[in-house]
Amino acid sequence: MSGLTLGRGPGGVRPTQTATFTTHHPSADADRSSNNLPPTSSQLSDDFSFGSPLSPADSQAHDGLLQDSLFPEWGSGAPRPGIDSPDEMQRQDPLATQIWKLYSRTKAQLPNQERMENLTWRMMAMSLKRKERERAQQSMFPARRGSAGPSGIAQLRISDPPVATGNPQSTDLTADPMNLDDFIVPFESPSDHPSPSAVKISDSTASAAIPIKSRKDQLRDSTPVPASFHHPAQDQRKNSEFGYVPRRVRKTSIDERQFFSLQVPTRKRPAESSPQVPPVSNSMLAHDPDLASGVPDYALDAPSSAFGFHQGNHHPVNHHNHTSPGAPFGLDTFGLGDDPILPSAGPYQSQFTFSPSESPMASGHPFANLYSHTPVASSLNSTDFFSPPPSGYQSTASTPQPTYDGDHSVYFDMPSGDARTQRRIPNYISHRSNLSASLQPRYMFNQNNHEQASSSTVHSPSYPIPQPQHVDPTQVLNATNYSTGNSHHTGAMFSFGADSDNEDDDGHQLSERAGLAMPTEYGDEDGFSSGMQWDGQFPGSFHSLPGFGPQHRKHVTIGSTDMMDTPEEWNHGGSLGRTHGSVASVSEVRNREQDPRRQKIARTTSTPNTAQLLRQSMHSNNNTSHTSPNTPPESALSSAVPSRPASPGGSKNGDQGSNGPTTCTNCFTQTTPLWRRNPEGQPLCNACGLFLKLHGVVRPLSLKTDVIKKRNRSSANSLAVGTSRASKKTARKNSVQQASVTTPTSSRAQNGTSFESPPAGFSAAAGRSNGVVPIAAAPPKAAPSAAASPSTGQTRNPIQAAPKRQRRLEKATEMETDEANKSAGGRSKVVPLAPAMPPAAANPANHSIAGGQGASQEWEWLTMSL
């Protein structure tokens, strides 16, 4: 047969075919064409059922032309081993057969029909040959794969240079003009189909190319990746020939797995030097493919090796290299504290590390060291941490970033309340220490957070808690599951000023979601009294910061009262939980529903939990909490931002109030149903405070009466309707005011019905120590004791029941109280400046009844304006 179609003759279509098709025999060709004459195209077509239109004469003519004139070597006609038959070719390489069919059908129209046919055969032969080579190589592949064999790149390199050389191993291979095999680039992946010579050379000289470790070898070398790691999937990729190609842009051609395998040097930069942003940082992940691949993993290792384990556990060497794979990408693994990227990341700047309490890393002592050394203070100090310290917590509305914990903490810490507890304040405090003073004092949760603080302080190093950095949704969401349940409060603590209104209810959930460890860190179980003696310490430190108190209202400052022991049931939720303890207290106490926005304002510690305050006053152990009640003069603070239930925690003034009669800094009256604070935290009487809050200007004394009248209307309306903004403000205030007024009015009316109302009202009054909310006149003289005792017993229970419930009860009670107050207390709420005095007198008794702290209680009533 002429070499045209079957490649016979010295210059056969594919000299290499023989190598590939060693089984092909001339006899097979003879079968196809007796006499070994080149089959005509028609014959080929018939044999192949291609239905070639060419006639034998045409085919022969073309064959003769090509053989004699162009390719005399074909004239030999010596049958060369070739493809056995199209059928076999079909079986061996259907694709090649299809291509051959394509050309066989179109060759009639092609300028060089015979030549094209030859090329077609060559292509098919190449494909078949390639398959044969592959099979031959596959036999070697297991060994090659086991051994460091050239990776895809190396193979390509190996195959490329020798391509031009003839394959000596192919017996028929000669430098034939038509030996296209060596010159034709496989139409398929070159790596998949290296040229025959290249393949053979690569087989013999696999090491000739730059040896690239096989993926398997690297994987073997690499330390086992934690199950949490996602890289194993990458390893699968890497096993493939192109595994060396990174899913993302690889920093180096070297397998990125080395980085994960602790072969940090292979990484672009060592983990130590590289700013391992906490895996949670999405932007970081986007920037760092390695981290991106590892991020989900880092925390999922239950050890949260990133958290505590890195510390002592997996790779002490990488102890600070939080990237140590041994601690599978825990936060520590990434060296969050050290990570320069974190600071660059934004609000977490300055190695914000995490929200102090919530951040699994920052909270736990294991990380206390980690993050303490981290100059958290630098960034967190005043501005980076959520917001300037004066904003108490960050202005949560503007800087929700405490939810960094939401990013991490929630995922990391939420796994267990204990974890959160463990990672709790201690480290954070150390960071806080770096933070502005206000932040520090604020977190002066007595480290005694009972066991909470201690556990958070002490346990973190090992963080037995898996603290999966990635959310354990149940962990994150079920703050109640945590003994601390602080996540609830945490949410409140870090409620966003703007959003906090609705967060009162959502606060704990939010915190849970956020995984804020704050409440936990505050020691919810222990109640506010146990862990977070925020109020006493915090109000002073918190509000002591100039402008910190009044301003922080908006910023959902953590009020000391909030830390007050909320009902233990809420405690688990975390006293911080606005919905639960402190947060719920003020906002809830207020007509939270009436003023959803304010209601949302998370009364974090900043907002005294009236119930908590009352309760604490009852317990009288939370003196600091009382501080917040005492702080109430500071409550004027909340008048600074009337729109916000802006009562920060207890105020300095509150302390003054407890120490002596509070004097309105505006009208100098010492008699007022409710003490408020101006933005500076100076005590204002209810009238002045309300005026300031409503109008944003100091109440002109000349307008005092008018203002009071106006305010009274709005208060009554707000209480009833809570429609207008002022009304809403009033309503919020009224929640407390109602409490105070309600205590008189409600205590009469509510003693029977308002079991909840007095708690709501009273709790609101007590909890509002920081709030500007115009607490209605303190309980009437007669009513105070009645109200106080119901409040004492009932308020405490309602508080325990739940500030949120109080809020609702309060709302219902407010409606009742509204009517009662409108009739009786409506004026006294606003106007009660005068009535307040008798209540004030009664208030001490009331308060002492409730809290056993007369002056403190009195101030609590005054402070209820929060």
Curated annotation (Swiss-Prot):
<dbReference type="Pfam" id="PF07573">
    <property type="entry name" value="AreA_N"/>
</dbReference>
<keyword id="KW-0534">Nitrate assimilation</keyword>
<feature type="compositionally biased region" description="Basic and acidic residues">
    <location>
        <begin position="589"/>
        <end position="598"/>
    </location>
</feature>
<dbReference type="InterPro" id="IPR000679">
    <property type="entry name" value="Znf_GATA"/>
</dbReference>
<dbReference type="GO" id="GO:0045944">
    <property type="term" value="P:positive regulation of transcription by RNA polymerase II"/>
</dbReference>
<keyword id="KW-0804">Transcription</keyword>
<dbReference type="InterPro" id="IPR013860">
    <property type="entry name" value="AreA_GATA"/>
</dbReference>
<keyword id="KW-0238">DNA-binding</keyword>
<dbReference type="GO" id="GO:0008270">
    <property type="term" value="F:zinc ion binding"/>
</dbReference>
<feature type="compositionally biased region" description="Polar residues">
    <location>
        <begin position="733"/>
        <end position="756"/>
    </location>
</feature>
<dbReference type="GO" id="GO:0000122">
    <property type="term" value="P:negative regulation of transcription by RNA polymerase II"/>
</dbReference>
<feature type="compositionally biased region" description="Polar residues">
    <location>
        <begin position="33"/>
        <end position="46"/>
    </location>
</feature>
<dbReference type="GO" id="GO:0005634">
    <property type="term" value="C:nucleus"/>
</dbReference>
<keyword id="KW-0539">Nucleus</keyword>
<feature type="compositionally biased region" description="Low complexity">
    <location>
        <begin position="776"/>
        <end position="791"/>
    </location>
</feature>
<feature type="compositionally biased region" description="Polar residues">
    <location>
        <begin position="602"/>
        <end position="618"/>
    </location>
</feature>
<feature type="compositionally biased region" description="Gly residues">
    <location>
        <begin position="1"/>
        <end position="12"/>
    </location>
</feature>
<feature type="zinc finger region" description="GATA-type">
    <location>
        <begin position="664"/>
        <end position="688"/>
    </location>
</feature>
<dbReference type="InterPro" id="IPR011420">
    <property type="entry name" value="AreA_N"/>
</dbReference>
<feature type="compositionally biased region" description="Polar residues">
    <location>
        <begin position="392"/>
        <end position="402"/>
    </location>
</feature>
<keyword id="KW-0479">Metal-binding</keyword>
<feature type="compositionally biased region" description="Polar residues">
    <location>
        <begin position="15"/>
        <end position="25"/>
    </location>
</feature>
<feature type="compositionally biased region" description="Polar residues">
    <location>
        <begin position="273"/>
        <end position="284"/>
    </location>
</feature>
<feature type="region of interest" description="Disordered">
    <location>
        <begin position="260"/>
        <end position="287"/>
    </location>
</feature>
<dbReference type="InterPro" id="IPR013088">
    <property type="entry name" value="Znf_NHR/GATA"/>
</dbReference>
<dbReference type="GO" id="GO:0000978">
    <property type="term" value="F:RNA polymerase II cis-regulatory region sequence-specific DNA binding"/>
</dbReference>
<dbReference type="InterPro" id="IPR039355">
    <property type="entry name" value="Transcription_factor_GATA"/>
</dbReference>
<dbReference type="Pfam" id="PF00320">
    <property type="entry name" value="GATA"/>
</dbReference>
<keyword id="KW-0010">Activator</keyword>
<feature type="region of interest" description="Disordered">
    <location>
        <begin position="382"/>
        <end position="404"/>
    </location>
</feature>
<keyword id="KW-0863">Zinc-finger</keyword>
<comment type="function">
    <text>Major nitrogen regulatory protein. Positively acting regulatory gene of nitrogen metabolite repression.</text>
</comment>
<dbReference type="Pfam" id="PF08550">
    <property type="entry name" value="GATA_AreA"/>
</dbReference>
<keyword id="KW-0805">Transcription regulation</keyword>
<keyword id="KW-0862">Zinc</keyword>
<feature type="region of interest" description="Disordered">
    <location>
        <begin position="562"/>
        <end position="663"/>
    </location>
</feature>
<feature type="compositionally biased region" description="Polar residues">
    <location>
        <begin position="714"/>
        <end position="725"/>
    </location>
</feature>
<feature type="region of interest" description="Disordered">
    <location>
        <begin position="188"/>
        <end position="245"/>
    </location>
</feature>
<feature type="compositionally biased region" description="Low complexity">
    <location>
        <begin position="619"/>
        <end position="629"/>
    </location>
</feature>
<feature type="region of interest" description="Disordered">
    <location>
        <begin position="1"/>
        <end position="89"/>
    </location>
</feature>
<protein>
    <recommendedName>
        <fullName>Nitrogen regulatory protein areA</fullName>
    </recommendedName>
</protein>
<feature type="region of interest" description="Disordered">
    <location>
        <begin position="711"/>
        <end position="763"/>
    </location>
</feature>
